[in-house]
């Protein structure tokens, strides 16, 4: 795992696990501009249409890399993920030609820690 923090964001590098013909990331996503944000349990104001991590498989590549449930995915391998549909996000994450996925995520606990340190 390689990670760094800046203003509430973290970089997470996931090495996909090969299982036969499939490359496994070990996490699921929810959200997207085509989804109802009021159904997103991670959106604090219920208007955020971002892409969020909804499940992380125990012992899988994502957990090993440090990804957490509730992380908001801002970028995938340099691609902006802030205004994409759920299907566009899924396709970007599961590209067969990419064995490593580099994510830029926002984590609520990181955001709160940064905000509190700025107030101190």
What residue ranges belong to the model's regions?
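PDZ domains, with a preference for the canonical peptide-binding region formed by the helix
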Residues: 68-69, 75-104
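PDZ/PDZ-like domain segments forming the peptide/carboxylate-binding groove
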Residues: 30-75, 79-82
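PDZ-domain C-terminal substructure recognizer with occasional recognition of PDZ-binding tails
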Residues: 2-23, 28-30, 90-120
């Amino acid at each position: 795992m390689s990670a760094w923090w800046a203003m509430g964001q973290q970089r997470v590098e996931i090495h996909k696990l090969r299982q036969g013909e499939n490359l496994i990331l070990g996490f699921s996503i929810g959200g997207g501009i085509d989804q109802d944000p009021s159904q997103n349990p991670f959106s604090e104001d219920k208007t955020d249409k971002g892409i969020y991590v909804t499940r992380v498989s125990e012992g899988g590549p994502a957990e090993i890399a440090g990804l957490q449930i509730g992380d908001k995915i801002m970028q995938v391998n340099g691609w902006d993920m802030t205004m994409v549909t759920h299907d566009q996000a899924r396709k970007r994450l599961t590209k067969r030609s990419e064995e490593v996925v580099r994510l830029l995520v926002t984590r609520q606990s990181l955001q709160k820690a940064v905000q509190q340190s700025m107030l101190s």
